[in-house]
């Protein structure tokens, strides 16, 4: 069937280009909306007590310091701490009350490739049972795909040592 349709296709014999390219009138330039915020960490409220923090692309086996702002949450007071069930790959460094809400600083370890979600719970010091769930979502690239452009609020603080079994000094048993 592909051979039957082959003769019916129209062919372009020539291509004509515009003689002048003005910056204002050119249709080939890409223009972005001024209101786009693609280079910052995005915080979205999923429910009354849950927030999703999207930190963009990260590189595997690297540690990152992530700073973001949570909006004012009525369930939290000024004395905020992490609940005693910590994550292995996400560690809370500080929570500071600011006029816009809370400035949260944490350290994230990109331990495997893919879209990863790590969770931490923030609670009040006063002993109330209210807590806020913060889910940090990252897209972790493997080491062969280059270095990602980090969003504002994300800073690389170190790389984990990579274990490669081919370069082992161990000679085995005698």
Curated annotation (Swiss-Prot):
Query: Tell me, which GO biological process terms does this entry list?
Result: adaptive thermogenesis; glucose homeostasis; positive regulation of non-canonical NF-kappaB signal transduction; positive regulation of protein kinase A signaling; positive regulation of transforming growth factor beta receptor signaling pathway
Q: Where are the transmembrane segments?
A: none
Q: Which residues carry this modification: N-acetylalanine?
A: 2
Q: Does the keyword Phosphoprotein apply?
A: yes
- Compartments it resides in: Secreted
- InterPro entries attached to this UniProt entry: ADISSP
Provide a Gene Ontology MF annotation, just one.
Answer: protein phosphatase 1 binding
Q: Name one matching Pfam family.
A: DUF4517
Q: Which cellular component, as a GO term, is one annotated location?
A: extracellular space
Keywords from UniProt, A to Z, are: Acetylation, Phosphoprotein, Secreted
Provide the primary localization.
secreted
Leader sequence segment? none
Locate the Phosphothreonine modifications and list their residues. 147
Any idea what job this protein has? Answer: Adipocyte-secreted protein (adipokine) that acts as a key regulator for white adipose tissue (WAT) thermogenesis and glucose homeostasis at least in part through activation of protein kinase A (PKA).
Q: Which PANTHER family has this protein been placed in?
A: ADIPOSE-SECRETED SIGNALING PROTEIN
Family, per the entry?
Belongs to the ADISSP family.
The name of this protein is: Adipose-secreted signaling protein
Q: What is the lineage of its organism?
A: Eukaryota, Metazoa, Chordata, Craniata, Vertebrata
């Amino acid at each position: 069937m592909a051979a039957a349709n082959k003769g019916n296709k129209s062919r372009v014999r020539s291509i004509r280009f515009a003689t002048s390219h003005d910056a204002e009138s050119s249709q080939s330039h890409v223009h972005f909306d001024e209101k786009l915020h693609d280079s910052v960490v995005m915080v979205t409220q999923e429910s009354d007590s849950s927030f999703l923090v999207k930190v963009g692309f990260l590189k595997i086996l690297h540690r990152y310091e992530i700073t973001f702002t949570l909006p004012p949450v009525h369930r939290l007071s000024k004395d905020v701490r992490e609940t005693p069930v910590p994550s292995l790959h996400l560690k809370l460094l500080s929570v500071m009350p600011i006029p816009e809400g809370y400035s949260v600083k944490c350290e994230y370890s990109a331990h495997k490739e893919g879209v990863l979600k790590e969770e931490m719970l923030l609670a009040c010091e006063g002993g109330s049972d209210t807590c806020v769930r913060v889910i940090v979502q990252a897209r972790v690239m493997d080491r062969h795909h280059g270095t990602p452009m980090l969003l504002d609020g994300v800073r690389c603080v170190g790389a984990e040592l990579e274990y490669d079994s081919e370069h082992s000094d161990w000679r085995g048993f005698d």
